[in-house]
Regions:
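Ligand-binding "clamshell"
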Residues: 25-32, 54-58, 168-180, 242-244
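Early extracytoplasmic/lumenal segment of secretory-pathway proteins
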Residues: 1-23
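A bilobed periplasmic-binding-protein/Venus flytrap-type ligand-binding module shared by bacterial periplasmic
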Residues: 69-76, 111-114, 188-203, 208, ...
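Mature extracytoplasmic/periplasmic domains
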Residues: 195-254
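A conserved helix-loop-strand patch within extracytoplasmic ligand-binding domains
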Residues: 37-97
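Conserved C-terminal helix/tail region of periplasmic/extracytoplasmic solute-binding proteins
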Residues: 250-280
Length: 280
């Protein structure tokens, strides 16, 4: 991002997350897409082509998507995993893994409390902070990647986890399962976009169009086990993936949760809260 803002890079295609797209649009860092070069856009599920971070997909197209949830060991956790509150259950002390990621960890806590994960209300944010400080003695570790090995080795009972990672873990250990709590979650999107610093906009659009070919989208999704927004790719995926309700939930996806939005200057308040939690 810093390189693009400084104009010192020649990237033609970038793959930002949804809240970064919103920020980059606000800073006029992205080209508008010429859909005359993107005829494969028709392959995308319409549920994903007009979301809050980029209305009418003027500057980006979705590449992969998924949810945040809880991956858990069915032998260690026998009750329903239907609420974020289970991450605060004292009987799992020392067996809970949380993400070392401020927006994700604070976000699911806000959802547990009934608030938006994009809140700018300091009272709500402080309530989430106190909940996470209270949870800290129960937490085995705050991780980003190494939690996966611990879940496979059955060293922990549960972990905050992205949906695609959960599917890979379940492939490695059949005792693991994935759940999306009923309070709602984060819907995330990785996207494809063209920065204004690109010197090859038309060629970049042709590459994005190539990535939206059903067989290419299916290969990418199958390899990393994250959901594809390409509706024509679903029939090319392994049946166990295409019919997995945690990878491909049906209906109105907005009922599952929220997309992270760019918080602007208020991001510093989340950073301060996260520092207080980690240092408590």
């Amino acid at each position: 991002l810093a390189k693009i803002e400084a104009g010192g890079t020649a990237y033609d295609v970038i793959f930002p997350s949804e809240y970064m797209i919103e920020y980059m649009i606000s800073k006029d860092l992205l080209n508008e897409l010429d859909y005359a070069n993107l005829d494969n856009f028709k392959n995308l599920d319409e549920r994903f082509t007009n979301l809050a971070y980029d209305a009418n997909s003027k500057h980006s197209v979705p590449y992969l998507w998924g949810t945040m949830g809880i991956v858990y060991n069915k032998n260690m956790v026998t009750e329903p995993v239907d609420s974020w509150k289970i991450l605060w259950d004292e009987k799992y002390a020392g067996k809970i893994l949380m993400l070392d990621s401020s927006r994700d960890t604070i976000g699911v806590t806000l959802k547990m409390l009934g608030y938006s994960l994009n809140t700018k209300n300091m009272d709500e944010l402080n309530e989430a902070k106190e909940a996470l400080i209270a949870q800290k003695p129960l937490v085995r570790a705050y991780e980003v990647d190494t939690y996966k090995d611990q879940m496979i080795a059955e060293e922990a009972a549960m972990a905050l986890c992205w949906s695609g990672d959960a599917m890979l873990l379940i492939e490695e250990n059949e005792n693991l399962a994935y759940a999306i709590p009923q309070e709602g979650t984060n819907l995330w999107f990785d996207t494809m976009a063209i920065p204004k610093t690109s010197q090859n906009k038309e060629l970049a659009e042709k590459f994005i169009n190539f990535m939206m070919r059903p067989e290419i989208a299916a290969k990418n999704s199958d390899y990393i086990k994250y959901a594809s927004p390409n509706k024509e790719a679903l029939s090319l995926l392994p049946e166990e993936d295409a019919t997995n309700p945690y990878l491909y939930p049906e209906g109105d996806i907005t009922q599952l949760g929220e997309v992270f939005l760019d918080l602007g200057e208020f991001t510093t308040e989340y950073d301060k809260v996260w520092t207080e939690i980690k240092s408590s």
